[in-house]
Amino acid sequence: NAEYGRAMSGVVNVVTKDGGSKFEGFASLGVSTYSTENTDIFIGLSPDLNRSTDLKFNLGGPIIGDKVTFFTNVRKQTNLGHLNGLRLFNVDDYSNFYYDDPQLWYSEKSGDSSYVPMNTGLGLSALFKLSFNFIKGIRFSTLYSYSDDSWFGYDHGFKYNPDGRSESVKYTRYYAFQLNHMISQKFFYELKYSITDNEYGNYVFKNPFDDRYVHDVFFDSYGPG
């Protein structure tokens, strides 16, 4: 639709409420988990390990009467999923079964054998807005918002090396200034200026030269062993 097209082209119009002359707020916490009798399929599934939470909080009100008001909104989400792996191997472990002689085969297993959630997501978002009404008919506001999201997708090839999966990350920072001038009951204009800063990534370690990376040759299963 048109709104989606504008968002994809970088044209973003963020509309948020202003704080009022009285303090108003809201808070909520949601918690969920998983339970199953099929423990041979969903290994290690437990309420403590695979708990998900959703925390929401907002607050608005006056700073200087109705001349300066604020509004803030925060949300934190944690989803630890329902698919676990078993940490038999660490990321920098490697195995070598390329030799014909079994005496030369090598497998390094330095993991702690603990269960690790493998389809997870973490999200934190926040918004803060200041509104100013010093001059009749003129209102201006400043707004700052950010979101930090990270998630892992389940990969069966890493069931016993769950820390070897790459993590997806997304950071967004948004800054905005808005001026609204009401000239009459039928005529007004708005001026808006905003900056958006986005960062995306997908990696095991952020540094591509991290010496904990194991060469790709040790990832395939080819070899006599």
Task: Show the residue positions of the predicted features.
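Short, P/G- and charge-enriched loop/turn segments at secondary-structure junctions
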Residues: N1, I43-L45, S114-V116
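Outer-membrane beta-barrel pore domains and translocons
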Residues: V15, S28-S32, N73-Q77, S145-S147, ...
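Flexible, solvent-exposed coil segments and beta strand-coil junctions
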Residues: E24-G25, G30-D40, D101-G111, G121, ...
